UniProtKB/Swiss-Prot annotation:
Species the sequence originates in: Candida albicans (strain SC5314 / ATCC MYA-2876)
Protein name listed in UniProt: Nascent polypeptide-associated complex subunit beta
Self-association state and partner proteins as the record states: Part of the nascent polypeptide-associated complex (NAC), consisting of EGD2 and EGD1. NAC associates with ribosomes via EGD1.
Gene3D superfamilies, A to Z: Nascent polypeptide-associated complex domain
NAC-A/B domain residues: 33-98
Disordered as annotated region, ranges: 1-28, 124-157
Keywords on record: Cytoplasm, Nucleus, Protein transport, Repressor, Transcription, Transcription regulation, Transport
Family: Belongs to the NAC-beta family.
Function: Component of the nascent polypeptide-associated complex (NAC), a dynamic component of the ribosomal exit tunnel, protecting the emerging polypeptides from interaction with other cytoplasmic proteins to ensure appropriate nascent protein targeting. The NAC complex also promotes mitochondrial protein import by enhancing productive ribosome interactions with the outer mitochondrial membrane and blocks the inappropriate interaction of ribosomes translating non-secretory nascent polypeptides with translocation sites in the membrane of the endoplasmic reticulum.
Record carries keyword Repressor: yes
Amino acid sequence: MPVDPEKLAKLQKSSAKKVGGSRVKAKKNIKTEQDDTKLIEALGKLKATKIEGVEEANFFREDGKVLHFNRVGVQGAPASNTFAFTGYPQEKNITQLIPQILPQLGAENLEILRQLAEQIQAGKTPKDFNTGSANAAADAGGEDIPDLVDQKFDDVE
């Protein structure tokens, strides 16, 4: 095997500087279990218990998206008003979940769902819809509430 004298001289020159071979820095493994243990400890301090029978959970966001947990674990501490939902969420549009949600809703929620469907068709964001309905409800509800400014409570009928 022919050896190039220039390469050999270059290698000998650089070998005087090197003590060891090239080292690849090992990647640091970040364990997510540590975060879970902290969560479990915090829930243990609150005396949270596992709630059975919850098959799925949906969290409605202000931007119209829904966080859907298909297989969910629920732990709750009602005394401290704390509930933990664990699992892998899927971000979906509300239109994808309407067939699954309809049987679970009561009569009072169907009106809200109808308004939400109209609002989606109109192209508004749910945030705009919520502020508009809150303002309309405040205006409509203000008719039967008397003004009590600069009056005594006993004088107002």
